[in-house]
Amino acid sequence: MGGMISSAGAAGVINNNSETTNMKENADSLNFEDRTYETRTMKVDGKNVTFRAYENIPYVANPVDTTYQSMNVYIPEAYFHNEKDHKYTAESAPIFLPNSVGGYRPGKAATPTLFKDGEPNAVLYALSRGLVVAAPAARGRSNETIEGVYYGKAPAAIVDLKAAVAYLHKNDKNMPGDANKIISNGTSAGGALSLLLGATGDEPDYAPYLQEIGAANARTDIFAISTYCPITDLIDVDWLAYNTSVGRMKAPGAFDARDNFTGENNLFGTATIDNQHFTKFASFNGDGTAVADEHIIKMMNPLNYIKPNGSTEHWRIRYGEIDNNTSMAVTLIVATRLANYGYDVNFDLPWGIPHAGDYDLEELFDWIDKIVNE
């Protein structure tokens, strides 16, 4: 694989003014091998990290919005010279798949970054450890055309992430990295999507949505997931009491508010309705407006898909001890179900940690090295 030193661009279907055009791309647009790239070098812990940056790659043939249906791929330079990078080669390197979704809003494709304190973000740190990085963007609940049509409501975000995975499987022979070793990562709503990506594998519920956007005809299962403070299992946090040692943040009906005005109500809207309830309790005891389609509600909850003999073997779940955005019981329930079905679960409630993610990158990538090399 080769290319000129340039930034890979993509013509938007929806531009900065969210104007919609009709775009059809043929299946050849999903081939990675002819993509252009830019060679970059950044420092991590005083050492040079050199990699090739392939950016703004559409991962579907019929995108609704190329800004949010594209991804950035970063590959250590060593793999183009038949050299090892840390423990890995071009054939064995796992693929780190971080999403940047927060609050179920649209998430742009992540880039390698150094914070003000000089510490690397997860993308750059992954490269420093020899991983290939595929960072997909994804649509979210606030995407809207100038005509007032919403195009990022549930299940758009998880469909987009699954399409990105399908792209990687399709191009497994065309690019460095092992698509059989994809590790997803996300925080908060992005953490919930990471869980969902692992739980759903090749579930047929998503097939019509993938076909509609022109996803590659390939597998959508992944090897492992990492999740921080996942905002998940939204319908089951309607208890009357909350963890008093942490303090209550949300009233009962934590995510499906009776006034139909939370971000999660916004998530379950439609193309023409901005907000909808997703529990009968909130609708009946609140404003009486409609409840979202049951099948779509199902598609956004990993507990509906976690079952024995799934394709994702390894699960790393973190929920901070002073995080009151949801109950730590939610992640405990998810971890317990996974463990009961025999999956490899690495679960922790780190002391003194609030609603946050990527705070233990060295531990995270030590875990990745361990599960990949077992």
Each predicted region: which residue ranges?
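Sec-dependent signal peptide cleavage junction
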Residues: 2-18
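Catalytic-loop region of hydrolases
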Residues: 13-87
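Short beta-strand element of the alpha/beta-hydrolase
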Residues: 71, 86-104
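Alpha/beta-hydrolase active-site loop
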Residues: 150-174, 360
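Primarily recognizes the serine-hydrolase "nucleophile elbow" in alpha/beta-hydrolase
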Residues: 170-247, 297
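C-terminal catalytic histidine-bearing segment of alpha/beta-hydrolase fold enzymes
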Residues: 239-240, 314-323, 328-374
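Long, low-complexity, polar/charged, intrinsically disordered or flexibly structured peripheral segments
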Residues: 259-303
